[in-house]
Structure formats: C-alpha cells, structure tokens
Amino acid sequence: MKTKLRRSSGNVFRDLGFPPREAENLRIRSELMIRLCQLIRQRGLTQVAAARLFGVSQPRVSDLVRGKIGLFSIDMLVNMLARTGAQVTFSVKARARVA
C-alpha cells in the first residue's frame, strides 16, 4: 500500500477538514491555550495557583491543560493571559487566493 503525502496548509485544523473560519478560530484558541500551559510549566504553578493567577476555578485550569478547546473562547483565553501581565497581539494578513 502506497502512502500519499500532502503539503500542509499551515493550519492542522484546516488539514483535518474543518471549514476555513472554524479552522482559524481553532488555531488561534490552540495557540493561546499552549501559551497558558507553557506559562504554568515555566512558573512551576499548581493548578490552584494558576487558577488564582488566571482568575478562574481550578477545574477550568484542568480543562485547559487537558486541551478541552471547545470550552474556551478567544476572549476568555486572552483575558486569562492578560491577568498574567502578558500582552497579546494579533496580526491579520490577507490570505493568498487559491485558484
């Protein structure tokens, strides 16, 4: 059996077949969640300490570290990052049109 390789679009969610708008939303949320999880690890925080820092409950931090992406909005994730002193910036670019 031959395996076919495809070039990635750069968005794993798009590659998995999600509609473009949903794929982009999922990509952004996943990046924000990854950054929050990195921050927890870098600072050596317990889930309780992270919850206090982020202004959420410990079960919400558990959902975060378990990757429950559907439970978080971009707004919530940005607010959690802002409470850590982080500055969240976005860059909007026109996508190349595919013929």
Predicted ranges, named:
Residues 65:
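DNA major-groove recognition helix of helix-turn-helix
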Residues 1-34, 99:
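N-terminal flexible/basic segments that precede or flank functional cores
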Residues 40-42:
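Short amphipathic helical patch at the helix-1/turn junction of helix-turn-helix
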Residues 44-62:
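Short alpha-helical DNA-recognition segment
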Residues 89-99:
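Short, charged recognition helix plus adjacent turn
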